[in-house]
Structures are given as structure tokens and as C-alpha cells.
């Protein structure tokens, strides 16, 4: 699996948006970068589906543009006017050429899911990497209304319980993708460090 970060050149605040070509060409989140649909079109002619990790504005602001341009199916945990398929914990969904398990991971958002495949984890905002808070593994913020550090800690533990040892890459909602081959450690180690920091009740952004 080789996702393309189609928001890599964004000059506005947005999540990372990943395009995965293959048997089921998939966009993970839609982001908030105007013109994202044009960047997608530079890489693929058709888009089969959009899968949302959650529905915060930085993940869905440009969803309408993507849906209008490609008319893909829309998968989401929470209700959405354009949702064609609901997601539930334990579901399996094809991302590119790889089957991924849907893992319900609330804490940062009540509707948050992560996607775990054989080789890759799409962690959304539950686990992030090199995002300006900590360079080597951190967690999404939990200080806003409706968010919960306790639930996020449980979600990190759930990911660790269900993460295959074969996963060597992590694609977070913010920061940089992580690859074990170049990162010098495992995806599991990055998540464990994020969990340790969350359990110490460290603030998301240290002073």
C-alpha cells in the first residue's frame, strides 16, 4: 500500500487526506484544502469511495467538492446527509488492494474510527506523528467539549490489542506518515509512546 497525501502542499489548516489507488480506489478523509478534488484528479480518473475517520471540520470541509467531482460512495460512523454506508466496529472494508478492519476509537471525537490493515494503520487523530507537539508519537487533543482523555486512552489500548505485527506504516490525520523501515522503530512503539504520554495526562501541546 502506497497512499498519496493529496494535501501535502496545503496552505490552510487541514487534516492529511490519503488517496489509495487499487482494486477499490479510496480517499481517507476529505480535508479542508480548497481544490483537493483537482489534486485527486491528477492521480486517478475515478474514485470508488471516501472513508471518514471522523467528521471534524478539518476532515470534511471539502467533502462536498469531492463528492460532486467523483460521485463516490461515502462511508462514515456517524450520520451524514450523503452517507451511503455506515461503519461499525469490526467491519471490514477494502482500501485500495488491502482489507482493513474498522476499529471504533473515540476520545478525540465520538464518531472516530481507525482503519487497520495487514500492512498499514490509518489512525486519524487518535495517534499522530511529528505534528508539532511531539516529534515521535503523540495523541489527538482531548480538551474540547465532547472529548475525553479517558476514552482516548482506551482507544489507544484497543488499537494495540488489535494491531497485527505485520503493520509497518502509520498514516495519521496530522503530522507525517510513519514508516518502520525508515523510522527506526515499530508502529507499535510509536503508539505505546503516545499511550504513555496520554496516561501521564501530559497536555497535547507542552509549554
What are the language-model segments listed below?
Residues 24-26, 49, 98, 119-120, ...:
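Structural motif
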Residues 19-22, 44-45, 164:
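Flexible, charged surface loops at secondary-structure boundaries
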Residues 1-40, 114-130:
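Conserved beta-strand hairpin/beta-sheet module of binuclear metal-dependent hydrolase folds
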Residues 50-60, 104-111, 170-176:
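Histidine-centered catalytic micro-motifs
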Residues 33, 110-198:
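Metallo-beta-lactamase
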Residues 10, 30-99, 189:
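Active-site HxH/HxHxD metal-binding segment of metal-dependent hydrolases
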